[in-house]
C-alpha cells in the first residue's frame, strides 16, 4: 500500500466547506499514480510506448464528509494485475482523528494506441 498526504483546498468544497464528491475520484487518481511511481512506473513512459490503460470502472463509498482544510491521507493498493487489467482499492482518511472518509476501487484495462 502507498499513502500520500494532502490538504482539502477551498476550491474543492461547496458553500458549507464540505468537499464535493467528485474530488474523491481525483484523490483516487493521485493515489494510483503515487503507487505506480513507487513501483517504478512513470505514466509518460508508457504513453510514449503507446501503452495506455483507460479506467473502465470506478466507484466510491462515502463514509463521512471531508471539510475545508482537513489534512487527509490517500491510500492506494493494487489488488489485481494481469496482462489485461489492473485493479486498485483506495481509502481516504482524515489525519487528525483517523476517520474513514471514503473508500473505493477502480479497474484499468491495457490497450495500445
Across the structure, where does each feature detected by a protein language model lie?
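Hot-dog-fold acyl-thioester-processing enzymes
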Residues: 1-57, 112-113
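HotDog/MaoC-like acyl-thioester-processing domains
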Residues: 2-4, 37, 67-68, 78-113
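Aromatic side chains
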Residues: 10, 20-28, 62, 68, ...
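A generic structural signal for ordered secondary structure
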Residues: 10, 58, 74-76, 104-108
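Hydrophobic beta-strand-centered segment that forms part of the acyl-chain substrate-binding groove
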Residues: 35-86
